């Protein structure tokens, strides 16, 4: 199964349809995706593609998500230009000085595991590490947290919600879009804090 991108997920569905003699059902799903994406893509035709940097947060650290990762593929589907696209790896470990040279228009922050810890880590680092204050994306208020249920490590059928969330972030055409992007980011951060993921993880560890 190729779950690193939405198209990859649907290619896998087609392959499984052939294996299990379910070609018609598989093709129906593929056709639904094609119709959805063609309509979505038309909304952004002719628009400038913003430069985007994606931070995938882990407890205690973060890495860069490239277009070869699922989150990166979603941003690419939405028309964003990943500033770390010249690689065949899914994720990169990069220092903030190198990130600064890329000058992204937008910084997206996603959480892989224990989202409650990750959002606190991001907030602390962006507040205390002075270099972030020199990024144009930070100066311009274009740093956004993403809903962890939509922007994980593997493709899911929640990609329409993910693309809808990216729309006002990448292409704000009005004050209402800018406000919506901020509200979505605030909600994503609140949901992460309220997830109770760390507590659940501790309970699992204690039960072993």
Predicted stretch roles:
Residues 63-92:
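Alpha-helical, coiled-coil/dimerization segments enriched in small aliphatic residues
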Residues 1-19, 94-134, 168:
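Acidic/His-rich segments in extracytoplasmic proteins that coordinate ligands and/or metal ions
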Residues 45-48, 76, 100-102, 135-139:
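Extracellular/periplasmic catalytic domains that process cell-envelope and extracellular macromolecules
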Residues 1-60, 81-84, 139-207:
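Extracytoplasmic substrate-binding proteins
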Residues 60-65, 109, 116, 152-155:
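Short, solvent-exposed loop/turn elements at domain surfaces
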Residues 57-59, 67, 87-88, 104, ...:
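Histidine- and/or cysteine-centered catalytic micro-motif in compact active-site loops
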């Amino acid at each position: 199964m190729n779950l690193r991108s939405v198209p990859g997920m649907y290619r896998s569905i087609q392959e499984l349809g052939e294996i299990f003699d379910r070609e018609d059902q598989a093709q129906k799903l593929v056709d639904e995706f094609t119709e959805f994406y063609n309509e979505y893509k038309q909304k952004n035709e002719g628009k400038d593609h913003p430069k985007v940097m994606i931070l995938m947060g882990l407890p205690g650290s973060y890495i860069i998500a490239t277009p070869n990762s699922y989150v990166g593929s979603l941003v690419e589907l939405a028309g964003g230009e990943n500033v770390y696209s010249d690689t065949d790896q899914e994720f990169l470990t990069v220092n903030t000085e190198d990130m600064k040279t890329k000058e992204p228009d937008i910084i997206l922050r996603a959480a892989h595991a224990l989202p409650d810890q990750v959002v606190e880590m991001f907030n602390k680092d962006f507040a205390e590490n002075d270099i972030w204050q020199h990024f144009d994306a930070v100066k311009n208020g274009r740093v956004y947290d993403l809903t962890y249920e939509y922007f994980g490590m593997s493709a899911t059928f929640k990609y329409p919600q993910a693309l809808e969330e990216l729309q006002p972030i990448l292409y704000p055409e009005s004050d209402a879009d800018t406000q919506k992007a901020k509200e979505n980011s605030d909600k994503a951060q609140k949901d992460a804090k309220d997830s109770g993921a760390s507590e659940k993880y501790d309970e699992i560890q204690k039960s072993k």
